[in-house]
């Protein structure tokens, strides 16, 4: 079953370390089955409960998955090898259009905002036991959510979108539970879910968001949570349309116990309104990060949700970091209040470059997608070859393997720091690397 490798150890910690180390070293491959617990216990001369504890630890770390009577096996993409490792090393002289970062020229200066926040902190320092939320941040965030039709609910603050998503998942789910996620989708979520000991269930995506039929199938087969990106979906640029939102709400209405998590990380950089699903199920959370519009290093996201979910998130947060710095919260309030970011201008800048690249590719017979945000997704017949040929031509793009499970091969190009005068050159290189072909669905 394991080929040449033999699991060793007498304690649960040693057994799990033996497996995890073998996975990290490539001695146990993704998808490889592990021995049944009783069989391994007999081989090692230990109690079956010891092996069960080791397997439980491995599930919780995202190294293995267990599928009932089919037993346990190494995850197709173990958490020990994060998707961020699937990238192109950018040599000198090659333009990097792969990293997904915002255009730093469109980010606001933080100096004045932090001066104002620090001055207030000097005047009234935040101490242990003080209110963890900045009242003005909560007021402004809730008002913004109300304007966008997000269901009413209490507000919490987390250290970025991924932190918020992790806290919501762990507030409701247990290792072994299944989570429906977009495919292709955000690589960090595809890493996070198995790292929490949860199972990924892929859901196809088109330009209008998750495919309702795939969502229905995933929920019918037992997925206990669904993660949806409202706008600027990474990597495809999809945005949930009004019609798609209505259809997905109808699907979710038949599964009221499913945990719904919406990621609106594109808030502040997109020109399409959101069509939220919030409130379609009993437990839900809606997350908004300031990273793309104001700067990734601020590490702040606002979330709202049903009272039970938000209360659990706040309670667990109190036992860990305690709170997100009120200095940072006050700085974000200052940025909002001062109008430091012109969301329409930022959205127009990204949109102009994105649409120009898609049009240039279409003129060369290359199918590409990017309805919102700063990324363009290009389905390709040979992902490895296309990425390598583009690198040779002087362009580093993101391999689609970082973002997909069952979806077809592709690659992502980030336009945020691309100059308009470069677009024809990029399109020429892509067309040369992948060849022209008829448009097709990318999921």
Descriptions of predicted regions:
Residues 1-118, 126, 139, 318-325, ...:
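N-terminal basic, amphipathic alpha-helical segments
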Residues 402-405:
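AMP-binding (ANL) adenylation modules
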Residues 350-358, 366-379:
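Conserved glycine-rich beta-strand-loop-beta hairpin in the small C-terminal domain of fold type I
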Residues 64, 178, 199, 259, ...:
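Residue-level detector of anion-binding/catalytic polar loops
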Residues 264-266:
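Conserved Walker B
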Residues 97, 202, 227-231, 261-262, ...:
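Short beta-strands and strand-loop turn motifs
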Residues 124-256, 268-281, 438, 442:
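Conserved core of the PLP fold type I
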Residues 286-347:
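Conserved core segment of the aminotransferase class I/II
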């Amino acid at each position: 079953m394991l080929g040449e490798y033999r699991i060793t150890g007498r304690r649960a910690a040693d057994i799990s370390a033996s497996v995890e180390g073998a996975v990290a070293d490539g001695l146990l491959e993704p998808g490889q089955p592990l021995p049944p617990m009783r069989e391994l216990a007999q081989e090692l001369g230990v109690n079956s409960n010891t092996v069960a504890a080791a397997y439980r630890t491995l599930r919780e770390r995202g190294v293995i998955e267990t599928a009932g009577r089919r037993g346990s096996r190494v995850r197709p993409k173990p958490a020990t090898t994060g998707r961020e490792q699937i990238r192109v090393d950018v040599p000198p002289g090659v333009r990097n259009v792969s990293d997904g970062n915002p255009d730093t020229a469109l980010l606001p200066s933080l100096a004045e905002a932090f001066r104002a926040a620090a001055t207030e902190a000097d005047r009234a320092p935040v101490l242990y036991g003080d209110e963890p939320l900045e009242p003005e941040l909560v007021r402004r965030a809730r008002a913004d959510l109300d304007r966008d039709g997000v269901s009413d609910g209490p507000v919490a603050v987390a250290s970025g979108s991924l932190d918020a998503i992790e806290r919501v998942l762990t507030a409701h789910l247990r290792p072994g539970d299944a989570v429906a996620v977009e495919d292709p989708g955000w690589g960090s979520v595809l890493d996070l879910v198995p790292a929490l000991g949860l199972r990924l269930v892929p859901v196809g995506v088109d330009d209008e968001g998750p495919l309702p039929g795939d969502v229905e199938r995933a929920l019918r087969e037992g997925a206990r949570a669904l993660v949806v990106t409202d706008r600027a979906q990474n990597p495809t640029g999809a945005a949930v349309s009004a019609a798609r939102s209505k259809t997905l709400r109808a699907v979710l209405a038949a599964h009221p116990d499913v945990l719904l998590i919406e990621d609106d990380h594109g808030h502040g950089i997109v020109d399409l309104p959101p069509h939220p699903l919030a409130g379609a199920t009993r437990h839900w959370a809606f997350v908004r990060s300031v990273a793309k519009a104001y700067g990734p290093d601020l590490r702040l996201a606002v979330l709202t949700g049903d009272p039970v979910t938000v209360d659990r998130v706040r309670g667990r947060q109190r036992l860990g970091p305690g709170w997100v710095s009120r200095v940072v919260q006050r700085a974000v309030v200052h940025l909002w209040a001062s109008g430091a970011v012109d969301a329409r201008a930022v959205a127009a800048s990204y949109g102009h470059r994105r649409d120009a690249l898609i049009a240039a590719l279409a003129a060369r017979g290359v199918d590409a997608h990017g309805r919102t945000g700063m990324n363009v997704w290009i389905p390709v017949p040979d992902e490895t070859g296309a990425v390598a040929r583009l690198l040779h031509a002087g362009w580093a793009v993101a391999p689609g393997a970082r973002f997909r499970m069952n979806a077809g091969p592709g690659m992502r190009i980030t336009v945020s720091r691309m100059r308009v005068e470069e677009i024809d050159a990029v399109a020429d290189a892509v067309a040369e690397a992948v060849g022209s072909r008829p448009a097709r669905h990318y999921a």
